[in-house]
Each structure stands twice: as structure tokens, then as C-alpha cells.
Regions:
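C-terminal regulatory/oligomerization modules of transcriptional regulators
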Residues: 1-2, 17-31, 37, 49-54, ...
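Short helix-coil-helix linker/hinge
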Residues: 6-11
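Pre-recognition alpha-helix immediately N-terminal to the DNA-recognition helix
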Residues: 13-15
């Protein structure tokens, strides 16, 4: 999953968290996060190529904002794993209840 690989880089994740608050220019992102502008631009390029952000040119600024689609896809992917773990948890819960019941029966039989 390309989105996960891109978001695994901590500085890119900081940018995404900042963009959750709303669109920002490269300069604003760099200033807010304490990056130099080329560093911010490099990370924004990767985020853009992965389809995580989109850019709009307004006068002489490039404004970046998050795209919802990659996060919706990521949510669906995570949900599929949550269902597996919930089923496993339910099975474990049933097994533990059965063990407790068996243990109680054994004590009652003694």
C-alpha cells in the first residue's frame, strides 16, 4: 500500500497533520513545522505523487490540501483487519467463557 509507505516518514506525517487543519502554502508549511522550504517542497512532491495532497496555484503561491480518497481507501483497508481481530477476540472470549464454565463444572462435581 503506497499511502502507508509515504505516511511512514515522520516529516510527511507532520505535514498531513498540519493540512488536516486546512490548506497551506509551501512557505506556511515550512514555517509552521520548522522545515526549510526545499525540504517541505520535497515532501510535498512525494505526497502529491502518492495522491495524498493536491496543489492549486493561486497567484504566485502553491496551496496544498489533503485529498480524501486515499484516507477513505486506507480506512477500508484498516477496517478489514479490524474485523479479523474482532472475530479472533470474540473466539477467544467464547473459549475463555467455556473454560470458566468447564472449571466451574469440575469444581461442582468434586
Amino acid at each position: 500500500m503506497k499511502v502507508i509507505n509515504v505516511l511512514a516518514e515522520p516529516k510527511r506525517m507532520l505535514i498531513v497533520e498540519l493540512l488536516r487543519k486546512g490548506p497551506h502554502s509551501v512557505g506556511e508549511i515550512a514555517e509552521e513545522l520548522g522545515f526549510n522550504q526545499p525540504q517541505a517542497s520535497k515532501h510535498l512532491k512525494v505526497l502529491s505523487e502518492a495522491g495524498i495532497v493536491e496543489v492549486e496555484a493561486i497567484t504566485n503561491k502553491r496551496i496544498y490540501k489533503l485529498r480524501p480518497e486515499p484516507f477513505q481507501e486506507l480506512s477500508v483497508w484498516v477496517e478489514s483487519y479490524l474485523k479479523i481481530w474482532e472475530e479472533r477476540y470474540d473466539n477467544l472470549d467464547e473459549y475463555l467463557k467455556k473454560m470458566q464454565l468447564d472449571e466451574k463444572r469440575n469444581k461442582d462435581d468434586s
